[in-house]
Amino acid sequence: YRRQRQMCIRDSLCRPQPGYETCRYVFFPGCQAGAIAPDVVTEAYEDLCRRTEGGVALMLGCCGAISEWAGRYEMTEKVNEQLKQELAKLGDPMIIAGCPSCMKQLKESLGAKVTGIWEILKEIGLPGQAKGLEIPVAIHDACGARGDTQTQDTIRELLADMGCTVVNTEYSRDLSPCCGYGGLTAYANKEMADKMTEKCLERSDSPYITYCMACRDRFVREGRESRHILELLYGINAANMPDISEKRYNRLELKEKLLKNIWNEELMMEKKDYTVAYTEDAISMMDERMILKSDVERVLSDYRENQEAIFDEETKELVTRSRLGNVTFWVRFVETEEGYLVRRAYSHRMNIMKRVGQ
């Protein structure tokens, strides 16, 4: 949870629409949308700015659900206070949420005025590029929408307006099962989360349409064609399943592009004079163990300064480590002409003590 929260903080952004100091609305797409389908976030925000009156601000970041699920209620309070301050600067606008869990969290934690982007699009009309799939689809209702009949109905109306044929499944609406992401199940018990995802997919062989980006990501990883409704509404098929590092990169790149293209602000990204490459095994291992490329690159940066590493005679690899926060990260790599090739990475909650003078 802590890693997720830290990434969301670093990738956060809050700006009023150009030409406004305060706004009638603020678009809050949710952290998973920016990580998985950043182009959808951009298209949706620009569309809202064009077709609504009174100004639409943009807020990228965490709604507080992650810390709430982790039982870190003191952190949730900090998130709430930060959100309240940012909203006050914008004139306490109505929040347009792109995620039902965000919508639920923001309503309950802040007592804020919140609506779903699906409600706004129902009111102002479909975007010009909206297009449904030509084959029957199944709807997966998000956990955050349980008890929210209005949201459930609106999603179905929008799909019908796009010409989608919806297949009824045995369990839907309030009985729709969790995809395995809710409550951070995928981080606490991966095997259980995988079983939950498989159970969801047993209901139909059709492509799944969701309105929660985390659900869409879980289903795609299991090999099922799945789209977030905003992908259909804005004619974008992200068609990917980014690993943990790619999700972080997508959020950072989204922030950088939006600042540059909409607010004419340059975000200075750190550049290195060497390259870090990864084997496919290393990438798979890092995603499984939730190790970011930025973690590995910080370890290698420390190695460049201290030149501390163990040489493995058998594999001809160098092994180095650094403690980041409360975790020690280990990297096995070889040096190349351009920089480094990472072959393995792992981590432990441990501290390596050095004896002075040895």
Question: Which residues make up each language-model segment?
Answer:
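Ribonuclease/tRNase effector modules and their secretory precursors
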Residues: 243, 247-358
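Active-site and ligand/interface coordination hotspots across diverse enzymes
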Residues: 11-20
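A conserved helix-loop-strand patch within extracytoplasmic ligand-binding domains
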Residues: 114-138
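Conserved beta-strand segments that form the floor/walls of ligand-binding pockets within enzyme
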Residues: 8, 26, 138, 341
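A short, charged/proline- and glycine-enriched loop
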Residues: 20-28, 131-137
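Single conserved hydrophobic/aromatic residue that forms the stacking wall/gate
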Residues: 1-9
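Cofactor-cradling patches in redox/metallo enzymes
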Residues: 32-118, 144-159, 163-258
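Short, flexible active-site loops
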Residues: 133-144, 182, 279-282
